Amino acid sequence: MEDEKNENLMTFIQFCATFITITLFIMPLKTIRLIIEKKNVGTVAGLQFISSVLNCFLWISYALLTSNTTMLFVNSIGMMFSIYYVFNYWKNINQVRASRDYLKKVMIACVLAITIISISYYNTVDDLDTRISRLGFLSSVVCVLMFASPLEKMAIVIQSKNSEGMIINVAILSLLCGLSWTIFGLLLNDIYIYLPNILASILSFVQLTLIKLYPPQILL
């Protein structure tokens, strides 16, 4: 009976994590379509899309090592969307120098991905556990660095007492996403899944709190 309850809980959490995460991956689609329509990236930051490709690639690699079909499915979809975003963002950068700089960032991400995979597989021919630990740790570090990027924006919000630019729907979805993957990781007893997502949940909660404390204002 207890096993059945745990299995039902796992199925429910898998569904929630999958649905919410894919929804988050789809959300930038509207922005990218506007960029394509205007043939200009405007003030949209493109690094987020490169980071998303790198993050998805690393977790796909981790999912393959651990035979985690849920993570494999979600991050494969996320990677496809993210590559689409990166390509169309780069294609619509009007300045030659900015376009080259963006390509350099893409190349750096590729080198970083290859380096992480190489470190994870180095001298671990018959040692799957070490390979999993290395890749899980390094993927978590990259994940945590991504989550830390909104901290600068939060500091600006606190100083200006204005949360303009923070979207409440995204913050809510991010919180739910972090919580669902945290529970998923805890059920699997996988520290490399639940630890970075605990941090993601905390940061999303802080964002929601800031939006509540400092409602968005249009500054003239």
Curated annotation (Swiss-Prot):
Sorted UniProt keywords: Cell membrane, Golgi apparatus, Membrane, Repeat, Sugar transport, Transmembrane, Transmembrane helix, Transport
Domain MtN3/slv residues, every copy: 12-92, 134-217
Pfam families: MtN3_slv (PF03083)
Species this protein is from: Dictyostelium discoideum
Subcellular location field: Golgi apparatus membrane; Cell membrane
Record-level Gene Ontology MF annotations: sugar transmembrane transporter activity
GO biological process, one term: carbohydrate transport
Transmembrane segments: 9-29, 44-64, 70-90, 106-126, 138-158, 167-187, 191-211
InterPro entries referenced in this protein's UniProt entry, alphabetically: SWEET, SWEET_rpt
Main localization category: Golgi
Protein name according to UniProt: Sugar transporter SWEET1
Annotated Gene3D superfamilies: 1.20.1280.290
GO CC field: Golgi membrane; membrane; plasma membrane
Family label: Belongs to the SWEET sugar transporter family.
